[in-house]
Amino acid sequence: MSQRHSEPVRGSQSVPRSPLFEGRFGRLFRSLPEAKFGKTEKENIDNLTTLATKMSSQFDPPTDGKDPEESGIPALYTYLGQFIDHDITFDPASSLQKQDDPDALTDFRTPALDLDNIYGRGPDDQPYMYNDDGKTFLLGSKLTGGDPKATDLPRSSAHRALIGDPRNDENTIVSQLQGLFHRFHNRTVADNPTLPFHDIQKLVRFHYQYMLLNDFLVRLINADILEDLKEKGVYEKKKLKFFHWKNDPFMPVEFSVAAYRLGHSMVRPGYRLNDDDSTLLPIFLTDEAKKNKPPFDDDLQGFRAVGGNRGIDWGRFIDVDTRVYDGSKAENKRRLQFAYRIDTSVVFALSQLPAAVASDPSALPLRNLLRGWRLGLPSGQHVAHAMGVKPLTDKDILIGKGVDKQDPSDPPVISIDKVASVFKDNCPLWTYILAEAMHHKEKVHIPVKEKVTITTPQLGPVGGRIAAEVFLGLLFGDNNSLLNLQPEWTPDVTPYTLKDFVNYALGK
């Protein structure tokens, strides 16, 4: 969705904390005070910088084999989360340099789980994304190393992906996940040749929304929270306590700037794409990665043609088959990689973002903290009180890796009040939600040949409730969603999870 050139960003002249409800962005807890972390702008920035530094891990190269920071969630869910984020939010107007009013921001994506990041404006308006039949997506050049039918995304002469949302080419993994959605759509067309394009779209969206409700949320959010939003086993709109809208759902900043930034803690230092040793790559090529022994000379950055040998072997990202968890060196190269645990640590590379990705600041944890402060988010403790939840004590808000056994070489885990006195009973909402997850752990049986369980933190009563209510609200507020059109609908295969979606796209 593009902004008309003659119009400024909606509400850009509004005073902070506007009472309007109908912007694309807004607040869940409008009466709560903004959290401050200093008396001056410099003090706020300095204190948040200190916290961001404590949340940033030391350099750790991507390797094969099991990893103590892994959760029981296969790695592809991290990038499904990124894909979903691109489906519902795009805010090019908010700033890290000045205070922002959420009511003044425009979401340039529809705040709905409608796959507009896949379909764009449709074949009539964006025919260059589709084949001549006007129903199926164009696919790109062939990739090797993984799935034999793998292709890159279609690209312009400048190697830019011709897709519904260019952000889905940000890295090699989300780029190839976008390609799977294209192939899922194309196979749905082939299996239903008489259905018109609109009905094909609906069928694909239903599978996507069903997977989100019955798989994605279940893995990330504590089960008791999800059950509390149901009546007789079915999600009910009347169960939403905190997310309310007048005409159309908006995008709450407590979700987009805090709760749904959980995925940043799930990112690994790098990933292996397939058997080729050149495809064990860091997410970003930092100076430390270049100096590693052996050194890395490339990374998983996107916005370029995917190398021909970089087709993803999807069994390394999702359990489309069953592999050995921890075996010989050769077996470890083929193992299923798992997302890192939801905790208050972020891998080193995300604190050293390349200039092409972000700058001023280049550290993702600091960018998140500054954005929350600039948008006037309340503290985690204030939000907990407003939700009727007993807040975590400062001693419970731990900063560092949420592993079972600390590595002596890692910085010690410390409580938030030891970072700076300004954070006593005043934790930034994003950090609070991550810390809360460290107290809501499940032992997850992972889909491998051995019998293995892994400690897996999940979003708790503050972060999980915000995330669940917003996802459900976006679906209840969309007249064309699964929950409104056919809430009893189920896929042909049940239970239906991300691996089933991937297998269908792969032609299995």
Locations of the language-model features?
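Terminal regions of secretory-pathway proteins
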Residues: M1-R167, N171-T172, A190-K508
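Active-site nucleophile-adjacent alpha helix/oxyanion-hole segment immediately C-terminal to the catalytic cysteine
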Residues: H182-D191
